[in-house]
Amino acid sequence: MIVVDTNILIHALVDSPRTPVVRRLWLEDPAWRLPGLWRWEFTNVLWLKVKTGGMQKVEALKLMSLAASRYDPLERPLYMEDALRTALDFSISGYDGAFVGLARLLGTKLVTEDKKLRKAVGSLACTAEEFLSEN
């Protein structure tokens, strides 16, 4: 079981250079867990892709529906106080605090592509490659 952030979710569904390793991650450990915040961040990423011309509106809507059907069951509750406490403990954003806080609560790692976040939280986070090489 791992917690993954929105970047990992996007790479799982939208073809990119990172997609193959993220799909290997899913095959290796499909017990992904997510805070409810993932939906808002995912929506914002799709909105930005449409706004900048990187994706058509109809494709974004289909991806949102696919993401909801795939990822909603993986969502786990996290009290906002825990997200805030985590954010304050590590001097990270409240958004990042939700993902890191859930990983702390579940006693697992956050898999993220965010280098700055990984540096801030140390051993609580890793890249997909690091996770795959450890397991």
Question: Where are the predicted features?
Answer:
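Short amphipathic alpha-helical face segments that pack within enzyme cores
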Residues: 41-44, 101
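Residues that scaffold the ATP/ADP-binding catalytic core of kinase and kinase-like folds
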Residues: 11-13, 45, 120-121
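Alpha-helix capping/helix-boundary segments
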Residues: 8-9, 38, 99, 116-117
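Active-site-proximal, substrate-binding regions of enzyme catalytic domains
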Residues: 43-71, 82
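Short, well-structured N-terminal submotif of metal-dependent ribonuclease cores
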Residues: 1-37, 49-61, 134-135
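Active-site neighborhoods of divalent-metal-dependent phosphate/nucleic-acid chemistry enzymes
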Residues: 70-113
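Phosphate- and divalent-cation-binding pockets in alpha/beta enzyme and binding domains
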Residues: 21, 41, 82, 119-120
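Acidic, PIN/NYN-like endoribonuclease modules and their adjacent C-terminal/linker elements
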Residues: 1, 92, 100-135
